[in-house]
Amino acid sequence: MFNISYAKRNAKYLFKLLAWCMMIEEAGPNIGNKQKVVLQLSKMLIMYIILHINAAFWTWRGYLKRCVLHFVFPRIFLPLLSDSPTITQAKKPSYCFAMDVGGEDISDLQVDQIVEEYSMDDLIRDRFRLSAISIAEAEAKKNGMEIGGPVVACVADLAFKYAENVAKDLELFAHHAGRKVVNMDDVVLSAHRNDNLAASLRSLCNELKAKEPQSERKRKKGSAKKEDKASSSNAVRITTDL
């Protein structure tokens, strides 16, 4: 990984190489094969340095995101996050560039996509840990208990891994059914594999039913009664016809 200082040291050579390449291109068709090879190598070197600068910029942008998160959320969670080795160790940005045989088509779009995915994964993981830590501390206060920082960090990591496994199961269920989108059928199948998750879903359904307005309940009950009456009247008509 090349850091900002490395990119700054090579930035001054970037402009010299650009000026040199412009002078060679202005020479037109009179240049020989040797000069053309030098021109292509110079372009490759320029893109190589640009990629280093770009990777360093994306790395520091990820650090800025983490700093914003630490300032937005309460400060009582900061020592717990700093103790976690997976948060303190920054991921190295993966970067590459593609070119054709002639060396003319060079793009760094893959750099932006790969580093952006890494930064979003870190952001989601940090937010999930903060939520798990806040829930654990709230439950500890409710029950009059005390929880150590390393214990809460381990619980948060386990909860995140469990959530990742549930997401993978849902994706596999949807893929097995020939779908690209997860629906409630996949959630039900995943709940059958875990009693605790099934109980949580049942309690959530009961809470939603309890919060449902009374008018909608009466409408549903009235429509159900009308359907029962219609079915019974149809049965009576069929018996009289016979």
From Swiss-Prot:
Residues 231-242 have a biased composition (Polar residues). Residues 208-242 are annotated as: Disordered. GO terms for molecular function: DNA binding; protein heterodimerization activity. CDD domains: HFD_CENP-S (cd22919). Disruption phenotype: No visible phenotype under normal growth conditions, but mutant plants exhibit a defect in somatic homologous recombination. Pfam families: CENP-S (PF15630). GO terms for biological process: homologous chromosome pairing at meiosis; interstrand cross-link repair; mitotic recombination; reciprocal meiotic recombination. Keywords: DNA damage, DNA recombination, DNA repair, DNA-binding, Nucleus. It is found in: Nucleus. InterPro entries: CENP-S/Mhf1, Histone-fold. GO terms for cellular component: FANCM-MHF complex. Involved in the promotion of spontaneous somatic homologous recombination (HR) events, which is opposite to the function of FANCM in ordered HR. Only FANCM is essential for replicative repair in the absence of the endonuclease MUS81. Acts in the same pathway as FANCM to restrain class II meiotic crossing over (CO), and acts with FANCM during meiosis to repair interstrand cross-links (ICLs). This common pathway between MHF1 and FANCM is in parallel to the pathway that involves the RECQ4A helicase. Belongs to the TAF9 family. CENP-S/MHF1 subfamily. This is Protein MHF1 homolog. It comes from Arabidopsis thaliana (Mouse-ear cress). The gene is MHF1.
